[in-house]
């Protein structure tokens, strides 16, 4: 997939000549709540990888103040998703409706929004992490340095450094 904006992008966006499926992720991120270390790459053979923020970072609303922090030298495969707190519904309340995302529009106290549901916090990815094809990383998860997330794994809990996990919900396969 060749980016429609390839001619206008910084030449440092694409790490390999004539490969428009892979980007250095920190060159395409605009949201200040998403921090990406040097040399971290994202590959997408389905969609334009420049659109990572739109297509892969989901339910990331500014009102929650949660962040996506990705370390250096990470490899993120096509379709990996990062699901944030706003994807959660308040199972302990009277309604399953997503009232908290409307706090601003309804002029409610925005200071209460994070107490309106179980806010899990930031997603933090260490250095040298490999995230496989269509893996899903849930809100609040911390993945240690050197970890490997298998294809289509759903990661709901922290992953220790240098650990390979896979499955739904992801479980340790072995250390590396």
Model regions and ranges:
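Extended, small-residue-rich solenoid/repeat segments and analogous flexible loops
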Residues: 3-34, 99
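Short clusters of hydrophobic/aromatic residues that line enzyme substrate/ligand-binding pockets
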Residues: 29, 94, 173
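Flexible, glycine/small-residue-enriched loop-and-beta-strand segment within the central core
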Residues: 34, 41-141
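A generic "structured core" feature
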Residues: 75, 148-150, 154
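A donor-sugar binding/catalytic signature common to diverse glycosyltransferases
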Residues: 141-144, 154
